[in-house]
Amino acid sequence: MALLEDLASVEPEAPECSGGRETWRAATARQILRRNLYGVDLAPESVEIARLSLWIRSAIRNQTLTDLTHNIVQGNSVISDPAVDPRAFDWQVQFSEVFADGGFDAVIGNPPYVRQELLGSIKPRLQQEFPSVYNGLADLYVYFYDRGLQILKPGGMLAYVTTNKWMKAGYGEALRRTLARMHDLRRIVDFGHAKQFFPDADVFPCFAVVQKGVEEGDGEALIEDTLEPERSRLLDARNQAEAIDVGIIPRDLVRLDDLPAQIARSSFHIHRARLGSDAWSLERQEVHELLEKIRRSGAPLLEVTGAKPTRGILTGLNEAFLIDTTTRDRLVGKDSKCAPLIQAYLRGQDICRWLPDWAGLWMIALKSSGDHPWPWADLGDQAEACFRHTYPSLHEHLKPFEADLKRRQDQGRHWWELRACAYWELFTRPKIVYQEIQYHPAYAYDEESNLCNNKVFFLCTDYLVLLGILNSPAVWWHNWRYLPHMKDEALTPVAFLLESLLVPKLKRRFERLCGDICRHLLICSRDRRTTIRIVLDWLRTQHDVQKPSTRLQAATNLSSDEFVSEVKRSRGRERSMSAAALKDLRDEYARTIEPAKNLMAEALQLEYQLHDLVNEAYGLTPNEVKLMWDTAPPRMPIPRPPHV
């Protein structure tokens, strides 16, 4: 308000006067700098750069530069106690003239992204200063939201560019609750994993505009003198506003040279009542209603199966404990007693849809003495000698890693042991395995007692119907809007969200049918994989294709001509093939690959049946199924069914 009054009283010189308009603009900028613009940054160099930039914009020839030492200052914006940080900054003391008027009218910022692991020493203070949004796993920018709102006057506006993680992550629950209940969200624009804003950073930018809520009591006293004419309007707006302006711009479509127009074109409104402490969904109303319908169907996964998402083994030093088949055979050849301790394991990249694709890798599963009664468990200084005598080849293999193994945080009672684990026995049971980070919808059934590394999670259950539901298009469509997004728009099925996923109740007849379909799809996947291995072995031995291309590793997706062309390309131009060799390729295709392609066609029809069964279990109408496919995310597990 003061700025508007100042501007109204300034009469610019006539345009024809030399430098008149420029002088007026510079004078106006100086007024703004002195009375209206404030800034705080932790880095002194950033403070100097900001001051310099503002001086350049406001300098007037032959006049002293505006003194910015009070307005643009160094300090820790979120810590006010100098005992915690000597750079602590007390906003109300340092900018007392602003708070004499109730606080700032606007706060604009791009808070730093500092992971919570680096905040350990100041977390107790953060909890004191920001109790309404504090979470021990929250990254630093969460507290900047609360600080920005604290220093605003009621009705003031906050605009931040931050990561979008707070909208879905567990640590953002308190912040979501605070923003939804205490303040007025005006606009949110989500850019996904856009790289255009900060090319050198791996970020998920979003833009949020929030109006500070008008409070009773103290809030009213602060603004009644200067904003009384506005008070009724602000309160009415809070009570009556039902819509928030939302924009979602896919990362590949972001154009910085056209951003305002893009935001305007992509904008739509959502009901304010949709947003609370649960993960936020910024979807159009019809999509939101479909999401809600899915989320009301059935019971939580944990309740249905009793299976909690469980992580694979964290070794602390993979190069010591994870070995290939050649190494495994060498160790067992030297000491056959160690064979039961070397077990097959699955990595994240081995998890394929329906069945895992074991890569011939092994884990030395030396459990902690706290979990297993090893003969050396309680021998103290003699423990290593006992281990060396009991399993000489394992000791010989691990000894070169001793120094690194001793430095592990994740270790057992002795340096050669894995960390304590209470669920070793679960690995021997049938289980559904899935990746920690999912680029594709891939849940696999493992009944081979495979171990898993820490990039794999599992659900200890033999309920194949659940496998079918998790692999369905409906659940991928839902999870795209439910699970946190990672780099390259991969999803992370964090445990507390996955165990809360609503699993629909199928009628008994449909449940049997769904289970039968899943069993057939497991067989199809196994047969396809066997075919691929047979073909690759044949190509290696008969046609010297030692490094098959990615396309050859999915030979059942190729036509006969494509198969021949890909073999020729893999062999290289300098190695031509005779007519007899080319005929041999086509004969092998007809003999081995063609039947597998037919089997895959049958599998696709089974997938379509499963698609319909799961949709029916969720109670979806034909129009809702069409909407699901019309708004399908990338990488749906199957092609759109012809009947949709």
Task: Place the predicted regions along the sequence by residue.
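Polybasic, glycine- and aromatic-enriched phosphate-binding surface used to engage nucleic acids
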Residues: 142, 149, 260-261, 267-519, ...
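Signature of N6-adenine DNA methyltransferases within the class I
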Residues: 4, 42-84, 91-336, 443-456, ...
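Active-site-adjacent structural elements in folded domains
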Residues: 15-25, 32, 417-419, 483-488, ...
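Short beta-strand element of Class I
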Residues: 36-37
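Non-catalytic DNA-recognition/assembly elements of restriction-modification systems
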Residues: 276-281, 297-303, 393, 505-644
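Short, glycine/acidic-rich hinge or "gate" loops at secondary-structure transitions
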Residues: 11-15, 63-68, 411-416, 485-487, ...
